[in-house]
């Protein structure tokens, strides 16, 4: 290489050093000073990994003094280049010697890097292009946000997430029965809202006992890093902001924190996009006296655009409280309780019509009349004829039924604000088998009851009933000895024998009180050394998590977990299938919640429910009412709350007084009313609600698409190649899993999310679901997203030179492959990416400037190419510069044409989708007040904003590859 003092060169291996200057040429060695970093490098003159920097006419370059010149011509004098051109500020003619060039010039544009000899390996060009295609594919997918979470592909959960998560500021009550996965539904919606940019700031309000569980669940299943806020965290946050809630984007807190006036005011002022309230059945309301908890959530719901309320028991605090929760979501719609009741009464006709449409039978006249009346603003006669015709194929008839059913769901009832799936509509649950074990009443309890009766304590009936259900509490009150009762209680003897005979089984034990749970643990430990752990409301979150983990542990873990009523709320242990009810709660909803700890989707075995009880006591009578009256042990009982309210007085009387005639009468009345309510529920609103909530065939089609996405081998191959290029160590661990570790040769100094110890990953959903310690990799996972960002955000793969060995073409034939990115910058919340995401535009030019991209696809072209040594590649580029410059200009013309068409297509797609959605919602608003005006306004504004951003779309050359034909 000819070197001369003052020449400017760049290091091929250390481009970060900037422009180097030749300061010494001696014998076979050359020394360069890199003024930007102050470092010297000595190279062999014959093999120096250096590229001479010579700019071309049309380039604008910066001088060392800070001014710029637009080059018009070059002059070479004494082996140094002098640039002549126009001063960028004064517009005067100036000259600039190459020694006076800025030391900090970076070759960021692909064409500059190519001409400066900064040429990447062939495979990196391909990986960069694949990364851009992957990002484009993900951005345009309507499944964005649903593919990545570590959850099972359960139809009703994914359907609700798809329906609700795609809305602007969704305001919804998720009220699936216990065990159907409301937390997962909420997590899917949160994940989707975040990934699509519909929400950025999210507040989750949960009972104090569930804060840590939500934190772990959001991270483990959804890769979302929430922060738990309590009073201490709020005080700490003052160092960063006067309002502690502004210090994090994703926050979990308890209702108790917000009971403090100052904290509530700060939360109200914190500009949330979405609020999630778990266990919303605790929000009690009456027109005269709404609870403090209700008023807290109401204050937030008035300023937060999106609200999700989660409850398994909508009517637990009465129908008024259920109405009040709907009122939180839409106060304009649910303004009057009496009007709400009157509307509910009309649901029967709607449900009958929906039932008729959902069955593959001929529509009866009554159903046709109902449909005609209910959809009076729409001409449904053609659809009815299609359904009733014998000459039409089944697929067309089914489509007509689905269309009418959707019209019905859209126009009537609470379908857009309330989702409730029942076990009757969701398959895959195990059986519940009830086992009762009677025992004689111990003499000590009999004596305690007699003494209590003689003392004539004036207790309210409900308090007397509660006392009768827990004789050990009464005994303790007299004996003042909290531990001794377990030494003679036959239920404890039975419990010990049961655990001894089921040593290999995990057993969940639930009792009403924390004191009872602690006493039982002491009994098991001291009498038989049985490994058990407790779980109650007085324990810290960390202590409860440790207890839960100890119970879940296969080897050396606890055989039994003993929970109190409140302590077990919201916790799930479906890896166990034996449930022991040490006592019974005086509320059928609480009984269902107990059983729901095991009876959940994901339970692999039939559930064995065991109840040891004391014969001829209130315990036996309550057991009979639950079992014979409600069948509440073996089936879920949606009407349990209503029945309890109706028969509470009679039930409490029976519990307090042993009167078999009264008991028989109560059972007869309960059974009769149970059947009535069951029939009414089957005929009424619930059927329509379930059709809307589980999604039917549309939900199944959604699951099919998600499953196909899981099995996309092309995606898996692309991700593995991405990690190869970055330099991540990959060790096959078997069982569908790989261990990823950072290596010494990684392309980037750090890879966020990949720590030094490594991480075990899988592309298989089932493996991820069975192993919490293995990360589930999809294109939505942060490790993949970060990898894509590392490549596309750097200069990796922006230049390449390759040889095409093809004797059908003349040797020396040149092709120029250009990858442009079409991009319209806009806030994520506009949803512009749905119509015009960053889009790769490929241009493949021959030496005459003809674009052959449509005729020669990327994959087949890429397979025929061979790599070229970087120094040879640099020489080939320099020799081809006279051809390349006009080709670059021609390529940009083709790319601009493609961009224009992209914008036209994107605008048409946006107009079609959003106008269609707007017209649909406007039509529905006329007949269904559930459609909120702000939803319509959001769509109108979205159309205006997106159009403006599309008009400002930009083109940027992202990568360039020069290809030469060779016969060698």
Swiss-Prot record:
Q: Where is the Helicase ATP-binding domain?
A: 163-332
GO MF term list: ATP binding; DNA binding; helicase activity; hydrolase activity, acting on acid anhydrides
Annotated residues for binding of ATP: 176-183
Which Pfam families does the annotation name?
Helicase_C (PF00271), RapA_C (PF12137), SNF2-rel_dom (PF00176), Tudor_1_RapA (PF18339), Tudor_RapA (PF18337)
For this protein, the record's InterPro entries field holds: Helicase_ATP-bd (IPR014001), Helicase_C-like (IPR001650), Helicase_RapA (IPR023949), P-loop_NTPase (IPR027417), RapA_C (IPR022737), SNF2-like_sf (IPR038718), SNF2/RAD54-like_C (IPR049730), SNF2_N (IPR000330)
Q: What residue intervals hold the motif DEAH box?
A: 278-281
Keywords, ordered alphabetically: Activator, ATP-binding, DNA-binding, Helicase, Hydrolase, Nucleotide-binding, Transcription, Transcription regulation
Establish whether keyword GTP-binding is in the entry.
no
Physiological role: Transcription regulator that activates transcription by stimulating RNA polymerase (RNAP) recycling in case of stress conditions such as supercoiled DNA or high salt concentrations. Probably acts by releasing the RNAP, when it is trapped or immobilized on tightly supercoiled DNA. Does not activate transcription on linear DNA. Probably not involved in DNA repair.
Q: Which NCBIfam families match?
A: PRK04914.1
Stated name of the protein:
RNA polymerase-associated protein RapA
Q: Which organism is it from?
A: Shewanella frigidimarina (strain NCIMB 400)
């Amino acid at each position: 290489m000819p070197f001369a003092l003052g020449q400017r060169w760049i290091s091929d291996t250390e481009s970060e050093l900037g422009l180097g200057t030749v300061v010494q040429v001696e014998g076979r060695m050359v020394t360069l000073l890199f003024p930007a970093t102050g470092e010297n490098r000595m190279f062999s003159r014959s093999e120096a990994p250096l590229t001479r920097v010579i700019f071309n006419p049309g380039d604008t370059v910066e001088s060392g003094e800070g001014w710029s010149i637009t080059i018009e011509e070059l002059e070479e004098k004494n082996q140094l280049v002098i640039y002549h051109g126009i001063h960028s500020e004064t517009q005067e003619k100036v000259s600039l010697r190459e020694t006076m060039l800025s030391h900090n010039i970076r070759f960021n544009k692909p064409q500059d890097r190519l001409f400066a000899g900064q040429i990447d390996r062939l495979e990196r060009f391909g990986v960069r292009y694949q990364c851009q295609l992957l990002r484009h594919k993900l951005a345009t997918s309507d499944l964005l946000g649903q593919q990545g979470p570590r959850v099972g592909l359960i139809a009703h959960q994914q359907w609700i997430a798809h329906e609700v998560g795609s809305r602007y500021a969704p305001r919804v009550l998720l009220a699936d029965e216990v065990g159907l996965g409301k937390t997962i539904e909420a997590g899917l919606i949160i994940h989707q809202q975040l990934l699509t940019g519909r929400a950025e700031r999210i507040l989750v309000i949960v009972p104090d006992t569930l804060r840590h569980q939500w934190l772990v669940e959001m991270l483990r299943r959804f890769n979302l890093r929430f922060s738990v806020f309590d009073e201490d965290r709020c005080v700490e946050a003052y160092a960063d902001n006067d309002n502690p809630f502004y210090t994090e984007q994703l926050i979990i807190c308890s209702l108790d924190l917000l009971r403090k006036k100052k904290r509530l005011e700060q939360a109200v002022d914190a500009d949330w996009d979405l609020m999630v309230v778990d266990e919303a059945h605790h929000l009690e309301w009456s027109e005269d006296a709404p609870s403090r908890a209700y008023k807290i959530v109401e204050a937030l719901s008035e300023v937060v655009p999106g609200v999700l309320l989660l409850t398994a028991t909508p009517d637990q605090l009465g129908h008024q409280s259920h109405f009040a929760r709907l009122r939180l979501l839409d106060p304009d719609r649910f303004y009057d309780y009496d009007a709400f009741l009157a509307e509910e009464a009309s649901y029967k006709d709607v449900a009958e019509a929906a039932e008729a449409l959902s069955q593959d039978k001929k529509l009866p006249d009554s159903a046709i009349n109902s449909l005609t009346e209910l959809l009076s603003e729409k001409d449904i006669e053609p659809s009815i004829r299609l359904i009733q015709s014998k000459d039409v194929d089944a697929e067309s008839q089914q489509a007509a039924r689905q269309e009418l059913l959707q019209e019905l769901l859209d126009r009537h009832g609470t379908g857009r604000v309330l989702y409730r799936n029942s076990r009757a509509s969701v398959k895959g649950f195990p059986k519940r088998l009830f086992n009762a074990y009677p025992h004689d009443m111990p003499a000590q309890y009999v004596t305690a009851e007699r003494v209590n009766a003689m003392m004539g304590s004036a207790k309210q009936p409900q308090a007397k009933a509660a006392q009768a259900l827990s004789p050990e509490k009464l005994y303790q009150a007299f004996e003042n000895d909290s531990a001794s009762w377990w030494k003679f209680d036959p239920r404890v003897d039975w419990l010990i024998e049961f655990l001894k005979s089921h040593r290999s089984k995990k057993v969940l034990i639930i009792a009403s009180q924390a004191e009872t749970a602690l006493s039982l643990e002491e009994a098991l430990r001291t009498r038989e050394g049985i490994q058990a752990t407790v779980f109650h409301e007085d324990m810290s979150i960390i202590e409860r998590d440790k207890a839960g983990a100890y119970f879940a542990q296969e080897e050396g873990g606890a055989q039994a977990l003993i929970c109190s009523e409140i302590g077990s709320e919201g916790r799930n242990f479906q890896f166990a299938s034996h449930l022991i009810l040490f006592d019974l709660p005086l509320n059928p909803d609480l009984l269902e919640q107990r059983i729901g700890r095991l009876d959940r989707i994901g339970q692999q075995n039939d559930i064995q429910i065991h109840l040891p009880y004391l014969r001829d006591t209130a315990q036996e009578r309550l057991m009979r009412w639950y079992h014979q009256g409600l069948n509440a042990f073996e089936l879920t009982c949606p009407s349990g709350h209503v029945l309890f309210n109706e028969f509470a007085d009679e039930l409490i009387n029976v519990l307090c007084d042993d009167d078999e005639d009264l008991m028989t009468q109560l059972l007869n009345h309960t059974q009769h009313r149970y059947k009535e309510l069951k029939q009414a529920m089957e005929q009424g609103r619930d059927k329509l609600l379930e059709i809307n909530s589980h999604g039917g065939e549309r939900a199944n089609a959604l699951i099919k698409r998600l499953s196909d996405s899981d099995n996309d081998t092309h995606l898996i191959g692309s991700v593995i190649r991405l990690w190869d290029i970055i330099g991540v160590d990959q060790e096959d661990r078997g069982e569908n899993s790989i261990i990823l570790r950072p290596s010494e040769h990684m392309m980037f100094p750090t890879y966020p999310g990949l720590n030094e110890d490594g991480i075990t990953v899988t592309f298989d959903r089932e493996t991820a679901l069975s192993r919490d310690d293995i990360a589930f990799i999809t294109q939505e996972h942060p490790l993949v997203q970060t990898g894509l960002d590392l490549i596309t955000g750097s200069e990796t793969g922006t230049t390449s030179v390759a040889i095409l060995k093809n004797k059908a073409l003349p040797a020396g034939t040149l092709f120029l492959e250009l990858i442009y990115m079409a991009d319209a910058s806009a806030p994520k919340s506009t949803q512009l990416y749905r119509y015009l995401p960053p889009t790769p535009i490929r241009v493949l030019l021959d030496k005459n400037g003809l674009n052959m991209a449509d005729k020669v696809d990327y994959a087949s072209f890429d397979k025929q190419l061979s790599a070229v040594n970087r120094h040879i590649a640099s020489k080939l580029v320099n020799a081809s510069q006279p051809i390349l410059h006009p080709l670059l200009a021609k390529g940009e013309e083709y790319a601009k044409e493609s961009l224009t068409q992209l914008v036209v297509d994107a605008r048409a797609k946006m107009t079609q989708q959003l106008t269609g959605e707007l017209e649909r919602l406007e039509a529905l608003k006329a007949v269904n007040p559930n459609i909120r005006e702000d939803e319509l306004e959001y769509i109108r504004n979205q159309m205006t904003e997106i159009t403006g951003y599309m008009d400002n779309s930009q083109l940027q050359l992202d990568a360039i590859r020069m290809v030469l034909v060779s016969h060698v």
